[in-house]
């Protein structure tokens, strides 16, 4: 408790040194005015006293606000020592190398394991690029919107102040920087705590790594941070990146930034460790956000954060739209659902990004949103509501169009197609109802179901009519032929009648009979009325006659009398 009070008093004394000097000036002016008796001199001294007094009041109010907000002084980060010789192996410490710092020479232990593990982090290292050198700057030469971000006493990255369409001011930086538990903003040696500030928008994609944080206005005003505007990057633009060891020891580097796709930027600008989240400035406007390096390609990488806000159309206002028009003539254009499908059929690959729950798909020069594809897939109907989103209670007004088949239409106040079957069989007389003029049925499925039901009923009625007419009609030719066939003798035998046995067939032929001997001709068929077929009774008569003739031709055993007659 006592330590915290002493620390606060010390910080108040450090920040109030200018106020004490102003108060001393006021006292000296007042004493000089008291020792003079000349009215003009007294008037001049009074004006001077009022000016100094106003100066003191303003300084005291500013220091009081800083004290309330918890403003503290930035801890100056010492410059690193430089290695001036080759590392050698020491059995006691491992690899050591001679270094120099502040004019003094000493040995530095080199942690080889830490260096090897750090070298595997390909996406977070920074790179020095050819023809892009770091230039030292004074803190007053840096952009007004640039701030340093601290995690307690450790510099984690950089950010900037931008304004949204609602007038709210936001902190823009890289998401991986914000995830290091940023606790303070720092500008010109002063730090302001910002713990607990809410996130407005963010994207965790490696190519679109940014976060938008809502910071109170008094925090910006205490540090004297200005507001920057967002502009869309051209296809190839010269940009400047700022960074440093702290908010007072800063550097800048200039190079060329190019677009790889609507969201991905590659820069040929030299950066060092701790520069992540630093804006890419082009003529005092922010056109990108530095993320890290791509060692395999020898370039640094950044994101086109202005394009992200332009696509989602909220959070931040993007200015200077003529640099990146929405028309098809621009370097990147928005696709509709039909064109997007054509691009997929052509084999063009799209990269998917997620910006605060909004899905965006981009190719090298084109982009679209999942919401636009969904809206195009489900076009609203006449009621203004998408068909897929309509409820069972919702009703849609449809145009009345008669169907193109006989007696089509539904009656008012009745189920669809329930009364289309208007014919009934009444003692062979068909009664037909009037033909409706229009069909007021809404669902097409109901119409088809009713039509199928009607066809089934009509088929059943026709079948019943045909069956009744075949049983009851007495004048048709078919009935007369049927009666005549029933009057003839039938070849079918009663169940109790035994089957007639055929005479046994002789196994040897008569010597007197010739092989060509024919039996008696069958009885001639009696001619009946034309068109009448032979009856089964006539066939049975012929079969009995043929059996009798066959039994007469079988001779008895040969005798000598017949043999002598033959020889004669």
Curated annotation (Swiss-Prot):
It is an enzyme of class 3 (hydrolase). Its EC number is 3.4.21.-. Residues 403-435, 469-568 are annotated as: Disordered. InterPro entries: Peptidase_S1_PA, Peptidase_S1_PA_chymotrypsin, Peptidase_S39B_luteovirus. The record marks 130-131, 319-320, 397-398, 499-500 as: Cleavage. The lineage of its organism: Viruses, Riboviria, Orthornavirae, Pisuviricota, Pisoniviricetes. Residues 539-549 have a biased composition (Basic residues). The modification Phosphothreonine is found at residue 339. The record marks 324 as: Interacts with viral RNA (covalent). GO terms for biological process: proteolysis; viral translational frameshifting. Keywords: Covalent protein-RNA linkage, Host membrane, Hydrolase, Membrane, Phosphoprotein, Protease, Serine protease, Transmembrane, Transmembrane helix. This is Polyprotein P2A. GO terms for molecular function: serine-type endopeptidase activity.
């Amino acid at each position: 408790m006592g330590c915290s009070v002493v620390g606060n008093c010390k910080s108040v004394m450090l920040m109030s040194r200018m106020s004490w000097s102003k108060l001393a000036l006021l006292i000296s002016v007042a004493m000089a005015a008291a020792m003079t008796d000349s009215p003009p001199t007294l008037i001049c001294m009074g004006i001077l006293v009022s000016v100094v007094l106003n100066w003191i009041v303003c300084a005291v109010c500013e220091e009081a606000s800083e004290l309330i907000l918890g403003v503290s002084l930035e801890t100056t980060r010492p410059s690193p020592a430089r290695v001036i010789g080759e590392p050698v192996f020491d059995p006691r410490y491992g690899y050591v190398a001679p270094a120099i710092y502040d004019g003094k020479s000493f040995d530095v232990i080199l942690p080889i394991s830490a260096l090897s593990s750090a070298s595997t982090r390909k996406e977070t290292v920074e790179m020095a690029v050819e023809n892009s050198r770091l230039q030292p700057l004074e803190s007053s030469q840096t952009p007004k919107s640039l701030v340093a971000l601290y995690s307690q006493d450790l510099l984690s990255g950089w950010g900037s102040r931008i304004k949204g369409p609602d007038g709210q001011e936001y902190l823009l930086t890289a998401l991986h920087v914000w995830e290091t538990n940023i606790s303070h903003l720092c500008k010109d040696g002063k730090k302001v705590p910002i713990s607990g500030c809410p996130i407005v928008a963010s994207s965790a994609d490696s190519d679109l790594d940014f976060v938008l944080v809502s910071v109170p206005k008094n925090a910006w005003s205490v540090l004297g941070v200005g507001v920057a505007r967002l502009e869309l990057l051209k296809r190839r633009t010269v940009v400047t990146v700022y960074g440093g060891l702290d908010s007072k020891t800063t550097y800048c580097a200039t190079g060329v930034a190019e677009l790889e796709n609507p969201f991905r930027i590659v820069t040929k600008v030299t950066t060092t460790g701790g520069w992540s989240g630093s804006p890419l400035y082009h003529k005092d406007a922010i056109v990108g956000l530095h993320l890290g390096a791509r060692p395999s390609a020898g370039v640094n990488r950044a994101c086109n954060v202005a394009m992200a806000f332009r696509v989602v159309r909220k959070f931040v206002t993007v200015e200077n739209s003529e640099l990146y028009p929405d028309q098809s003539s621009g370097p990147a254009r928005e696709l509709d659902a039909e064109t997007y499908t054509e691009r997929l059929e052509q084999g063009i690959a799209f990269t998917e990004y997620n910006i605060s729950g909004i899905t965006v798909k981009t190719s090298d020069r084109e982009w679209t949103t999942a919401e636009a594809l969904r809206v195009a897939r489900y076009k609203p109907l006449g009621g203004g509501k998408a068909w897929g989103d309509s409820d069972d209670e919702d009703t849609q007004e449809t145009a009345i169009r008669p169907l193109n088949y006989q007696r089509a239409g539904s009656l008012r106040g009745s189920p669809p197609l329930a009364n289309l079957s208007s014919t009934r069989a009444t003692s062979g007389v068909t009664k037909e109802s009037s033909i409706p003029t229009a069909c007021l049925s809404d669902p097409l499925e109901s119409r088809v179901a009713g039509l199928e039901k009607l066809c089934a009923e009509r088929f059943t009625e026709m079948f019943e009519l045909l069956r009744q007419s075949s049983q009851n009609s007495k004048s048709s030719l078919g009935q007369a032929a049927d009666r005549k066939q029933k009057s003839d003798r039938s070849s079918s035998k009663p169940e109790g009648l035994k089957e007639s046995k055929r005479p046994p067939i002789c196994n040897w032929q008569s010597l007197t009979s010739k092989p060509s001997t024919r039996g008696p001709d069958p009885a001639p068929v009696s001619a009946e009325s034309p068109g009448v077929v032979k009856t089964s009774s006539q066939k049975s008569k012929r079969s009995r006659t043929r059996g009798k003739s066959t039994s007469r031709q079988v001779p008895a055993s040969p005798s000598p009398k017949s043999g002598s007659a033959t020889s004669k």
